[in-house]
């Protein structure tokens, strides 16, 4: 073997070690990224768990959207105390939210179920725009509160609009859906959560 070949052999171990040192951080980064995505439900943000699940709904009191009516009656604002005693689907929405338009027909279908109540939190919106939105896409809300500064959304742990919560008869949050309601997640996640809440025993008076 020539002297040149000896030099190549002598240099190879060092070059291999350098390449290994470069690859280790990359492999570690990819492993952490894969673990992160797995914990987020394989990239599905609607599966991010909420710390509020199983806990009482925030004590939220919000004024009503002026001049909003449903079935000829004025729609009241949001009062968390009113959640107790019936299953409530609470939707956080805004007129400027494009996905909110897409989920509107599904919310209207939910509102037709007399076993539950659909309520809304109108997030950082203009009242006129909000009324026009509901006039165009329909008003599913038996109660709707205005959250002009976004404080209530923070209390509810909202990441962005739309988001939907299921609140049980005991006033505890039973389920949270991040992102718009779709036919798929309605059938596979939201409706089962609603049915589970409806099947739960009614709380005793005073609880």
Regions found by a protein language model. Give the residues of each.
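N-terminal targeting signals for export/organelle localization
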Residues: 1-67, 207
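A generic structural signal for alpha->beta connector loops
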Residues: 54, 59, 115-116, 141-142
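A short beta-strand-turn-helix
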Residues: 60-88
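Short pre-active-site segment immediately N-terminal to redox-active cysteine/selenocysteine motifs
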Residues: 86-88, 93-96, 160
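Hydrophobic beta-strand core positions in alpha/beta domains
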Residues: 89-91, 120, 166
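Structural microenvironment flanking redox-active thiols in thiol-disulfide oxidoreductases
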Residues: 101-138, 148-154, 188, 207
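Thiol/disulfide oxidoreductase modules built on the thioredoxin-like
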Residues: 135-140, 147-198, 206-207
